[in-house]
Amino acid sequence: MKKAQMTDGRLAWIIVIAILAIDQIIKIEVKTSMCLGESIRLTDWFYINFIENKGMAYGMSFMPKILLSVLRLVAISVIGWYIHLVVREKGRTIYIALLAMIVAGAAGNVIDCMFYGLIFNASSPFYVSYFVPFGTGYADFLMGKVVDMFYFPLIVTTWPQWVPFFGGEEFIFFSPVFNFADACISVGVVLMLLFCRKDMEGIGDTFRRGLQLKVTSKETVSDDEQDK
C-alpha cells in the first residue's frame, strides 16, 4: 500500500488545528483555575500572569471592540484564501507553514472574542471564572475579552537619571503580557521577514491571479448554463 503523502495543504491544516488546540487549552486552564490578576512565579524571568484585554496582541487597543473583531474575521478570511492560492500554485512549504501559524494565531484570539463572553462568567480578582449556559455569560457575541498569561521580565532595571522623560523610572524588557496565539503571530511574521521576503514580493500577483481565475470560472459556468 502507498503511504499517504503529506501535502502542503494538509500540513497547513495540521498546523492551524494544533495551534488552536494548544492555545485554547492554555487559555481555558488559566481562566478556570486562576483569579483575574493572579500571578504565578515560575522563574525570575517567567511568570504566569492572568489578565484579559479587549484589544489586539500584547494588550494594544486603538479602535472599538466590535470593529476590531470584524476586522480580525476579515483578515483571517483573506489570509486563509491567500494560503489556498499559494498551496494551489505550489509555493514553498516554509512559507505556507508560516502563513498557517499567523492565521492560526489570529483565529485563536478571535475565538476568545466570539465565544468567551457567551460561555464564561466575568473573571474577577476574588473568584475563579467558570462555564455558564451558552449565551448567559459576561458579554455578547464578538465582545469577549482575550485571555493573556505569559510574562517574561527578562531585564528589570532603572533608566539613568539623565534620560529625558524616563530618568529614574523602572525599565522592564519584555513587559507586555501575551498568549500562545500572540507568540505564533509574532514568530511567524519575524521568520517570514527573515526567510520569505521573495515569496512576499509576489503577494499582489498571487491575489490577482486568484481573482482572475474566479472571474474566469464564473464566466465559464455562466456560458455552460446558457448552452443548456
Located regions from the model:
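Alpha-helical transmembrane bundles and membrane-interface segments of multipass inner-membrane proteins
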Residues: 1-228
